Amino acid sequence: MARVSELAFLLAATLAISLHMQEAGVVKFDIKNQCGYTVWAAGLPGGGKRLDQGQTWTVNLAAGTASARFWGRTGCTFDASGKGSCQTGDCGGQLSCTVSGAVPATLAEYTQSDQDYYDVSLVDGFNIPLAINPTNAQCTAPACKADINAVCPSELKVDGGCNSACNVFKTDQYCCRNAYVDNCPATNYSKIFKNQCPQAYSYAKDDTATFACASGTDYSIVFCP
């Protein structure tokens, strides 16, 4: 009888915690690695974690968190103190990120306002395939499943990734600045990204690639979906 009471108490406590998190506006992100290699996941906020194939890292965003971004790092080595480096996506040589990652890196971006806004971004280039899956089945689940590294133009290639034209050439046209801020059409380079991943943000003014979902939705971010 005592065992039954104990189980009932644990179930009630778990439910209470879950309800409290929902009421408090906590948004949960499950970061999953389905790649056939290790990915060092990174998040702002969140920090970072090594994910071997099949592993998941959960990040809970506190109520009032206006925005977040997540990405995967590859080719990393870290010492026992969490210091090291990554071939792509490195964030100041730290396992637990407190600054944005080095380009190129595929990004999952999230903004909280009157509702949730999110996108898969290739504006900073590409390193690994990525998808965002909302728990709300009525919301779009954008993905970039292609290996853009395989079709990357030589002038954009770096070890382990494919840079954006803005990062490489730094011109107003490619970066949608100054005279191009209000009228910035796609370029031959951004079209390569768009053709490979139609649901992803291919350059700074590719606004059709932003998606919305009701507040209170949780998400999974999948590397190599």
Curated annotation (Swiss-Prot):
Expressed in pollen (at protein level). Residues 146-157, 158-170, 178-191 are annotated as: IgE-binding. Residues 1-26 form the signal peptide. The keyword Disulfide bond applies. Disulfide bonds join 35-224, 76-86, 91-97, 139-213, 144-197, 152-162, 166-175, 176-184. Extracting this recombinant allergen by vacuum infiltration from the plant (Nicotiana benthamiana) apoplast via tobacco mosaic virus vector could be useful in diagnostic and/or immunotherapeutic strategies for cedar allergy as it is a more convenient and inexpensive method than expression in the yeast (Pichia pastoris) secretion system. SUPFAM superfamilies: Osmotin, thaumatin-like protein. Keywords: Allergen, Disulfide bond, Pathogenesis-related protein, Plant defense, Signal. One of its GO terms (biological process) is defense response. Pfam families: Thaumatin. InterPro entries: Osmotin/thaumatin-like_sf, Thaumatin, Thaumatin_CS. Gene3D superfamilies: Thaumatin. Belongs to the thaumatin family. This is Pathogenesis-related 5 protein Jun a 3.0101.
